[in-house]
């Protein structure tokens, strides 16, 4: 079953390199623990350039529990990638190594297989800043430190979580955030429609694909706009109706009317590259909305149709036009107004610092690397004191 890839979607295949890793030790001081299946590889991919910079000064190894994920990562980075299926193998590697820091980009339950080690520091770095409920998950309390982009994350966590220790939050900015070169709006403007996925539970049902999608895109195309549809990698993973709506959207963009404006589906292009030749973003409550802010270009955010979706008021949602499902047919009019009269631009500009800690990726990278160095130094000091005390 494992070798045929027939496991449930969220389960790693557990086909590890354990035999080869017998007796192995790591030279690296940092590990990234990523037990996710391949479909969630995007969560780590965005961090690879940053982790490669950290590797140059501390050494970084990635530990996975899925052979498909490991193979995929090896094709995208020169970082050492290990696939460890057995707890005993992981125990041995940690015990034989002087790993000082473990980083985590997701809330996978299997993170606790690494979190149980008390000899190193554990830091959650996430995979994007957003106003989603999961951004203030109580699971954050499991980590020694939580690296956040800006004040918005600090405020959200301290407001939503009971008894969270403020000293565990470290503001580092967003190394992935960068402002593309300004661009004049062409005669045929390009709209990036980048909805999120349906989520794993009702409180996370932010996706507009089944509730807005076809009507929204039809309105934009009818208004003479080029639409680039960038679905989330997990769109349709949990709900057949969302998968069907996604398929319908793809067919819609292949129709002659959409083709006349150059509309297309483009799911694979890196996000920052996708931003470069786009004039407006229409998205859901998600990290994509915040990554867009440094562009300075208009932004429209949908309103979740599912009343169970947790979408509390926030500085971002208060500052941009919102599009409920009942108004999806007016998307073309809303976007045209934003292009002709971008009255929200000053408010959005103020939010770049609030959410992302600025738009200088080099400064954010420096803060991230320094924060990792600090955790390693603090861990080494504690371990050294314990060793001198004979413990």
Please provide the spans of the model-predicted regions:
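N-terminal pre-catalytic "stem/leader" segment of glycosyltransferase-like enzymes
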Residues: 1-95, 383-391
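A nucleotide-sugar donor-handling region in carbohydrate enzymes
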Residues: 2-16, 139-211
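Conserved catalytic-core segment of nucleotide-activated headgroup transferases in glycan assembly
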Residues: 39-53, 58-59, 177-251, 357-366, ...
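Extended catalytic core of nucleotide-activated donor transferases of GT-like folds
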Residues: 48, 67-139
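Short internal beta-strands
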Residues: 57-67, 145-150, 228-232
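A donor-sugar binding/catalytic signature common to diverse glycosyltransferases
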Residues: 123-124, 268-310
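Nucleotide-activated donor-binding/catalytic signature segment of Leloir-type glycosyltransferases, i.e.
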Residues: 243-267
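C-terminal amphipathic helix plus adjacent low-complexity
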Residues: 332-391
